Swiss-Prot record:
Its EC number is 2.7.1.30. GO terms for biological process: glycerol catabolic process; glycerol metabolic process; glycerol-3-phosphate metabolic process. Keywords: ATP-binding, Glycerol metabolism, Kinase, Nucleotide-binding, Transferase. It comes from the Bacteria. This is Glycerol kinase. One of its GO terms (molecular function) is glycerol kinase activity. It catalyses: glycerol + ATP = sn-glycerol 3-phosphate + ADP + H(+). One of its GO terms (cellular component) is cytosol.
Length: 493
């Protein structure tokens, strides 16, 4: 095999990464660059789309150099990305008309309220599997069309293009030749009928979004186009796309009905593959699109928590309680419990299963005896409590009581958090040998599309488990802790 590697581009909320994998799914080299976060007003979050592209393209060049390989050694590139984040650009100049509006941004709440007043809430849920929340792309697009001078007119003339970050990166990588997305990203726009797998005219009309803005939707594992790295060398196929959470689900090989994973990133995201059936949630979860064993469309239930690792960043950057995220395990382990302290990190509202954009964060149960260690421990426990909220909702919706859950993302290196997650949910928590499963999913999708790997069966032995965390507390202890959490959440609403 002359082409011995695949590359995953992992474009996240705070950084862009490129990771080189070999045929045994080993990580050969990687590169990472952070980029700026823009906060124009409270509750507003933006990125500079050109800075995202610059950071992502430079990591691609750097990862190749670190692996000491050339473009002719690479079979394919796969892309995984922060979902929902919205870019609109001029298709002639390639220049964005406004900063990218990030998934965390709440500015389009009034637009959501208007759509609710029009009686569209149930239609949106039935058609897209989503809720009318500022989280999703559709209302962000409308905000740009309505609030940036001249943009609506240009959009109606067909001069502009919309994309989530995957679409933006493919467009840049192919020098403006390919305007495409995949079903997992399309399913997060609030504009995509997940049953018919097509853009929905009724929702486009309701939001006043011209059809010409939207990309073509192609399978998650397919050849979309070719790119030359820095305009040089052999062309490489761009052959896999999946939104970050669906990519992690695929990277964990949760490709059969009833398999689930929890990703601990900026937010926390619990997904369960429900196979070919789209399960409508009664518990405030989302119905979304996942990727099946052969790259086909499957469905999943998803619970999203906005503040996971971002809570730890807050401890570091705003409170100065820690120097590094890794310090949290040391400080949390210095105390036996939180001394009754609960942190509810509703900094931008609450996600699933509450969906309360007006909730605000709270530190509850403080006494004179509360110290730094208790607060740090409460922050870690909050991540696990929020995941328990999601797990309970998912069990009720699916009728499946999970016995184990696969985990990935940066925070899974924290043994304290993983053990507390097992304790509070009463399920086994399985940590993989390779925790970069989001990037791995994109690499798998791209490699399968070009025949680098023959099937998902070939991949199964490449996804080993490093450690299994088993619950260590009893039911009474678990109930007392979780009741305290529910009381704390009630105080934020």
């Amino acid at each position: 095999m002359s082409k011995k590697y695949v590359i995953a581009l992992d474009q996240g909320t705070t950084s862009s990464r490129a990771i080189v994998f070999d045929h045994d799914a080993n990580m050969v080299a990687s590169s990472q660059r952070e980029f700026g976060q823009i906060y124009p007003q409270p509750g507003w979050v933006e990125h500079d789309a050109m800075e995202i592209w610059a950071s992502q393209s430079s990591t691609l060049i750097e990862a190749l150099a670190r692996a000491d390989i050339h473009s002719e050694d690479v079979a394919a590139i796969g892309i995984t990305n922060q979902r929902e984040t919205t870019v609109i650009w001029d298709k002639m100049t390639g220049k964005p008309v406004y900063n990218a509006i990030v998934w965390q941004c709440r500015r389009s709440k009034a637009i959501c309220d208007e759509l609710k007043a029009q009686g569209l809430e149930e239609y949106v849920k039935d058609c897209t599997g989503l809720l009318l929340d500022p989280y999703f792309s559709g209302t962000k697009i409308k905000w740009i069309l309505d609030n940036v001078e001249g943009v609506r007119e240009r959009a109606e003339k067909g001069e502009l293009l919309f994309g989530t970050i995957d679409t933006w990166l493919v467009w840049k990588l192919t020098e403006g030749k390919v305007h495409v997305t995949d079903p997992t990203n399309a399913s997060r726009t609030l504009l995509f009928n997940i049953h018919q797998q097509a853009w929905d005219e009724k929702l486009l009309n309701a939001l006043g979004i011209p059809r010409s803005l939207l990309p073509e939707v192609k399978p998650s594992s397919a050849i979309y186009g070719q790119t030359r790295i820095a305009g040089e060398g052999s062309s490489i196929a761009i052959a896999g796309i999946a939104g970050d959470q669906q990519s992690a689900l695929f990277g964990q090989l949760c490709i059969d009905e009833g398999m689930a994973k929890n990703t601990y990133g900026t937010g926390c995201f619990l997904l369960m593959n429900t196979g070919t059936e789209a399960v409508k949630s009664q518990q405030g979860l989302l119905t979304t699109i996942a990727v099946g064993a052969k790259g086909e469309v499957n469905y999943a239930l998803e619970g999203s928590v906005f503040m996971g690792g971002a809570t730890i960043q807050w401890l570091r950057d705003e409170l100065g309680l820690i120097r590094d995220a890794q310090d949290t395990e040391y400080f949390a382990s210095k105390v036996e419990n939180t001394n009754g302290v609960y942190l509810v990190p509703a900094f931008v509202g609450l996600g699933a299963p509450y969906w309360d954009p007006d909730a605000r964060g709270a530190l509850v149960g403080l006494t004179r005896g509360a110290n730094r260690n208790h607060i740090i421990r409460a922050a870690l426990e909050a991540i696990a409590y929020q995941s328990r909220d999601l797990l309970d909702a998912m069990s009720k919706d699916s009728g499946v009581e999970l016995k184990q859950i696969k985990v990935d993302g940066g925070a899974v290196a924290n043994d304290f958090l993983m053990q507390f997650q097992a304790d509070i949910t009463n399920v086994d928590v399985l940590r993989p040998e390779l925790t970069e499963t989001t990037a791995m999913g994109a690499a798998f999708l791209a490699g399968l599309a070009v025949g680098f790997w023959s099937s998902t069966a070939e991949l199964k032995h490449k996804a080993g488990i490093e450690r299994r965390f088993k619950p260590k507390i009893n039911d009474a202890q678990r109930a007392t802790l979780y009741d305290g959490w529910k009381e704390a959440v009630a105080r934020t609403r």
